[in-house]
Amino acid sequence: RRAQAAARKIARALGGVPIALRPSAKPAYHAAGAFVSGYLLALVETGIQILTRLGFSRRRARMALLPLIHQTLSNFERFGARATWTGPISRGDYATVSRHMRSLAAWPREFEQAYAALARISARVLAVRPKQTLQQLNRVLSKR
């Protein structure tokens, strides 16, 4: 108990939010952190690599993406994920999704796979009608 109290005090002092978890929940908790930290950076780097291959310098690519990243996170903080969600799937523009997928064929296969996986996750967790959105999305993605 003293150790837990000390840990909570340290977490608060560092600006964190103390959370008590069952040991069995810790791997999923850490997976959530990996999604929003390490994997977020992987997505940003993927965007930078695409832009550099299109002729941007790394610095210019980073500077081009940073305002979008900052605005997205700011909007998420203010309005939540669903209200912040933008892009072709959010507006039902599956022709653009198809064009994106075709364009990604020139990059490592993982880029295309990540785009498809994240598109499906977005539809599942952000769409107002997830089942219908996933059905339409899967029709487009299955053509690849």
Can you say where each PLM-predicted feature lies in the sequence?
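Internal alpha-helical scaffold of NAD(P)-dependent oxidoreductase catalytic cores
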Residues: 1-78, 133
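NAD(P)-dependent Rossmann-like dehydrogenase/reductase catalytic/cofactor-binding core
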Residues: 62-144
